[in-house]
Amino acid sequence: MQDLKTYLSVAPVLSTLWFGILAGLLIEINRLFPDALLFPFF
């Protein structure tokens, strides 16, 4: 039961960090390459 409580307290923190990093990365890509329907590095 203690492991479940630890998991339930760690998972929201990790997912918040992950989505924050992902959102920041997408914002920076859109700032560097505005209106890119396909990315110029392909």
From Swiss-Prot:
<dbReference type="GO" id="GO:0015979">
    <property type="term" value="P:photosynthesis"/>
</dbReference>
<keyword id="KW-0472">Membrane</keyword>
<comment type="function">
    <text>May help in the organization of the PsaE and PsaF subunits.</text>
</comment>
<feature type="transmembrane region" description="Helical">
    <location>
        <begin position="7"/>
        <end position="27"/>
    </location>
</feature>
<keyword id="KW-0934">Plastid</keyword>
<keyword id="KW-0602">Photosynthesis</keyword>
<dbReference type="InterPro" id="IPR036062">
    <property type="entry name" value="PSI_PsaJ_sf"/>
</dbReference>
<comment type="similarity">
    <text>Belongs to the PsaJ family.</text>
</comment>
<keyword id="KW-0793">Thylakoid</keyword>
<dbReference type="Pfam" id="PF01701">
    <property type="entry name" value="PSI_PsaJ"/>
</dbReference>
<keyword id="KW-0603">Photosystem I</keyword>
<keyword id="KW-0150">Chloroplast</keyword>
<dbReference type="GO" id="GO:0009535">
    <property type="term" value="C:chloroplast thylakoid membrane"/>
</dbReference>
<dbReference type="InterPro" id="IPR002615">
    <property type="entry name" value="PSI_PsaJ"/>
</dbReference>
<protein>
    <recommendedName>
        <fullName>Photosystem I reaction center subunit IX</fullName>
    </recommendedName>
</protein>
<keyword id="KW-0812">Transmembrane</keyword>
<dbReference type="GO" id="GO:0009522">
    <property type="term" value="C:photosystem I"/>
</dbReference>
<keyword id="KW-1133">Transmembrane helix</keyword>
